[in-house]
Curated annotation (Swiss-Prot):
Plays an important role in endoplasmic reticulum-associated degradation (ERAD) that mediates ubiquitin-dependent degradation of misfolded endoplasmic reticulum proteins. By controlling the steady-state expression of the IGF1R receptor, indirectly regulates the insulin-like growth factor receptor signaling pathway. Involved in inhibition of lipid droplet degradation by binding to phospholipase PNPL2 and inhibiting its activity by promoting dissociation of PNPL2 from its endogenous activator, ABHD5 which inhibits the rate of triacylglycerol hydrolysis. It comes from Rattus norvegicus (Rat). GO terms for molecular function: lipase binding; lipase inhibitor activity; protein-macromolecule adaptor activity; ubiquitin binding; ubiquitin protein ligase binding. Residues 176-251 form a coiled coil. The keyword Cytoplasm applies. Residues 204-249 have a biased composition (Basic and acidic residues). GO terms for biological process: ERAD pathway; lipid droplet organization; proteasome-mediated ubiquitin-dependent protein catabolic process; response to unfolded protein; retrograde protein transport, ER to cytosol; stress granule disassembly. Residues 258-340 form the UBX domain. The modification N6-acetyllysine is found at K68. This is FAS-associated factor 2. It is found in: Cytoplasm; Lipid droplet; Endoplasmic reticulum. Identified in a complex that contains SEL1L, OS9, FAF2/UBXD8, UBE2J1/UBC6E and AUP1. Interacts with YOD1. Interacts (via N-terminus) with UBQLN2 (via C-terminus). Interacts with PNPLA2 and UBAC2. Interacts with ZFAND2B; probably through VCP. Interacts with LMBR1L.
């Protein structure tokens, strides 16, 4: 029986090899690599049971990437469906409890049938010679490298010993890579911390400079505002002085003391000083206001009050008095004492 099986599988392999030159292998077109993995896993469990190493449920490239990132060994199993030793290897070796324990605890396990496009693609990369085929892959010298190949039927104890030997022989590379990676990470963290400290210092300096600029701008605006207020006050005083001079120039001549229609008025100013002047009965009270306004001692804004009876004289036009009355109409006598009330701050 054994010679017949050997002859059968040998002829089958020769036929498949020759067929490659006649037409392209349909397995070379990978369209659903994850589907290939899941399909193989289901067929494996249907044939050999659910007690097996944990399959990596992803593409070969993803398995390589994860093993590289996690710094773990990656065990690749390529299953030859038609090979005479595949069934015995899967049942007796790959699914042995001690083998399962070793694989699950110390490595990632990726497997696929070479009849699947994804498995066939990987077999073209690893170039196995026979089945069962196992390849141990790890990060070595910063690239994923095959560090061990197991081909042909193997017993559980030998499988464990050889896998352990391969891992022990190459463990130093992983340790070295871990140390280098930790050093790179520490360097990166240190650089990041330095960058963050630099950025924090830069932001603090920028904030200080911003506050300085704002303070300079605030002072500049304040000085400009003070200067504008000063100029405005100077213009106001100049305008006021010019207005006083105009009022003074427009005042009618003071009547003589002998004029029977003249009125002698004594003004008591807010600073307790007194001013005396004569006016004509026929003149408007506005003349009195203009006279007082032209005086240097007078406040800028004021009203004129009579004492008997106590009242405010309508010396400037208003809604009630559009045309202020004359001195006579206001009821003033030949001699009067009037009080100047300061209204500047009101």
């Amino acid at each position: 029986m054994l010679p017949f099986r050997f002859t059968y599988y040998t002829i089958l392999d020769i036929f498949r090899f020759a067929l490659r030159f006649i037409r392209p292998d349909p397995r070379s077109r990978v369209t659903d690599p994850v589907g290939d993995i899941v399909s193989f896993m289901h067929s494996f469990e249907e044939k050999y049971g659910r007690a097996h190493p944990v399959f990596y449920q992803g593409t070969y490239s993803q398995a390589l990437s994860d093993a590289k990132r996690e710094l773990r060994f990656l065990l690749v199993y390529l299953h030859g469906d038609d090979h005479q030793d595949s069934d015995e290897f899967c049942r007796n070796a790959l699914c042995a409890p001690e083998v399962i324990s070793l694989i699950n605890s110390r490595m990632l396990f990726w497997a696929c049938s070479t009849n699947k496009p994804e498995g066939y693609r990987v077999s073209q990369a690893l170039r196995e010679n026979t089945y069962p085929f196992l390849a141990m892959i790890m990060l070595k010298d910063r690239r994923m490298t095959v560090v061990g190949r197991l081909e042909g039927l193997i017993q559980p104890d030998d499988l464990i010993n050889q896998l352990t030997f391969i891992m022990d022989a190459n463990q130093t590379y992983l340790v070295s890579e871990r140390l280098e990676r930790e050093e790179r990470n520490q360097t990166q963290v240190l650089r990041q911390q330095q960058d963050e400290a630099y950025l924090a210092s830069l932001r603090a300096d920028q904030e200080k400079e911003r506050k300085k600029r704002e303070e300079r701008e605030r002072k500049r605006r304040k000085e400009e505002e003070v200067q504008q207020q000063k100029l405005a006050e100077e213009r106001r005083r100049q305008n006021l002085q010019e207005e006083k001079e105009r009022k003074l120039e427009c005042l009618p001549p003071e009547p003589s003391p002998d004029d029977p229609d003249s009125v002698k008025i004594i003004f008591k100013l807010p600073n307790d000083s007194r001013v005396e002047r004569r006016f004509h009965f026929s003149q408007s009270l506005t003349v009195i206001h203009d006279f007082l306004f032209s005086l240097k001692e007078s406040p800028e804004k004021f009203q004129i009050e009579a004492n008997f009876p106590r009242r405010v004289l309508p010396c400037v036009p208003s809604e009630e008095w559009p045309n202020p009355p004359t001195l006579q109409e206001a009821g003033l006598s030949h001699t009067e004492v009037l009080f100047v009330q300061d209204l500047t701050d009101e």
